[in-house]
Amino acid sequence: MENKVPLLSLCIPTNGRAEWVVPLLESIYSQGEDPALFEVVITDNAANPDLASAVSAMAHPNLKYFPTKSAGFTNQVDAFEKCSGLFCKMLNHRSVLLPGSIRMLLSLVERYRTEKPLIYCTNGVLKTKEEDIDCADLDTFVKRLGIYASWSAGTALWREDLQDIRSKPINSTFPHTVFLFDVREQGPYLIWDGHYHELQNDATSGGYNPFEAFGITFLDLMSRLLKEGRIQPDTFEKVRKDVFLFLRTLHFKEVVLPAKHGYILTDIPEKMSVYYGRRDYRIMVLYNYSVAPFELGANKVRKIFASLKRKVK
């Protein structure tokens, strides 16, 4: 790379999951983009020798692997610190980039390298007519994002915003929020809603209590912004409602239905009561168990049709 600063750094924090990271890397390098324009930085807090060997075998000059000792999700901060690109974009280690997505990200950098807004990438979930959504202030930014602000993989920032990052308050559950809320006192802010990746199988995801993480910790972060006057009460309420709907869906899938992931699901009523109260918890449970028979019946019908289709083939 002749010591030139790449336009784009793709940051991949992981806990040694070679079975996910390798397909992600393949989806990156199969696009054939000029390696001088971007770099890929992996930080692995499990220090998996299999992943290290797989990365070494790929022998790409712009691919960097760093074992780290940071606990849990704070590995995300390590990934950004190891980057040297003008623009740093986090990737979920379970993602696979879509064809042409690196070119899309490089174009994004070129469009905004002068203005340098704080950018968050929502991967098409907002379904807006325009992919580039300007936000005048943090309140507008948070209101448009809602619960998606909790999604670390959408995080992106300019290299210059990384100065003194360790002096900022870093939340151990949502460390990416330091980049969204604390590296700058004001905008400009931009949401990019381009669709650039898909997720691989998440059957083994989990390992934490989502009712504590989202229902308490994430809303604590929103409450701080409200108390500081950086977001308005209606924005906080919008995010609170978003989180409730998310937790209701998660409760339905992880508690009511038989299919389970590895989440910790203890003390749900107590955790829900912090920002919602026992009444909302009871409404959630009643709703989910009233819907369950219909969903289970629909699943059974889908399985029967799938079985018949296989037999026809």
Name the predicted role of every residue range.
Residues 41-53:
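A conserved acidic beta->alpha catalytic loop
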Residues 96-133:
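Conserved donor NDP-sugar-binding/catalytic core segment of glycosyltransferases
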Residues 88:
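Short aromatic/hydrophobic "clamp" motif used to bind/position activated sugar donors
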Residues 67-83:
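Glycine-rich, basic loop-to-helix element that forms the pyrophosphate-binding segment
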Residues 178, 185, 191-313:
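C-terminal subregions of glycosyltransferases and related glycan-biosynthesis enzymes
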Residues 135-213:
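Conserved nucleotide-sugar donor-binding catalytic segment
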Residues 17-31:
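Short, well-formed alpha-helical segments that are part of the catalytic scaffolds
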Residues 6-9, 39:
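Cell-envelope/extracellular polymer assembly enzymes that use nucleotide-activated donors
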